[in-house]
Amino acid sequence: MAVMYTGGAGRVGTVLRAGLEGRYPEVRLLVMEPGTELLTGETEFVGDLSNLDLLTELCSDVDTIVHLGGIADERSFPLILENNIVGTYNLFEAARRANVRRVIFASSNHAIGFYPSDTKIDNEVLPRPDSYYGVSKAFGETLGRLYHDKWGLEVVNLRIGSFREAPDDVRQLSTWLSHRDAISLVQRAIEAPGVGYQIVYGVSANTRNWWENEAGIKALGWQPLDNAESFADQFAGQTPPEYQGGGYVDPDYTGGLW
């Protein structure tokens, strides 16, 4: 099985690759700059998401793409448009042209960040993005729906919560995704049979979880193990945010919380 990562040298990709090292015989990395420290079975390709022809070539004979590339925080709309919207289209279109079986799209909780924090939601609610970044993730999920329905591409959208070694604040007692759970989640997203089209919250087994995730967990055969509640004493006295997206909902927010 050949697996390809976009953005594989970033913060999330580096952890995932280390946790899954040696599991797949061929791993291709699309990176912006040369010099990635390669692990077992990995090959580095330098380029970006703007080059559809290059992406199509790199996708040849690939079974699954883990799409982590793009901007990972709020930025101006022109930058989000170029990197996260056009870039994601190029990735899905390259996958279609190259007959890739499955795309795992790194979506985000910021696609639904304007839901109140006192409301538990599932994977069927309408998007309520809290930022241009969140809009780009809602777009990617919808684009994946089109590529699944129209061309049969299997798509797993992972609405990643707060990817950290440990929670940073009271909000993350609800949204935390541990490194261990992230690795097992992506492993199941790659290996689970016949997933069709799925939206799965990338969140650990947190007592204060805001997201009903049973359908996605069942579809992938995934079981998160960690619980942010073990860190709760560190944030005693902190008040949860009004909205699930936290600081991203601020009209003046331009990035920096990721």
Question: How does the language model describe each region?
Answer:
Residues 36, 43-83:
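NAD(P)H-binding glycine-rich loop region in Rossmannoid oxidoreductase-like domains
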Residues 50, 79-90, 98, 109, ...:
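Glycine-rich NAD(P)-binding loop of the Rossmann-fold in SDR/ketoreductase-type enzymes
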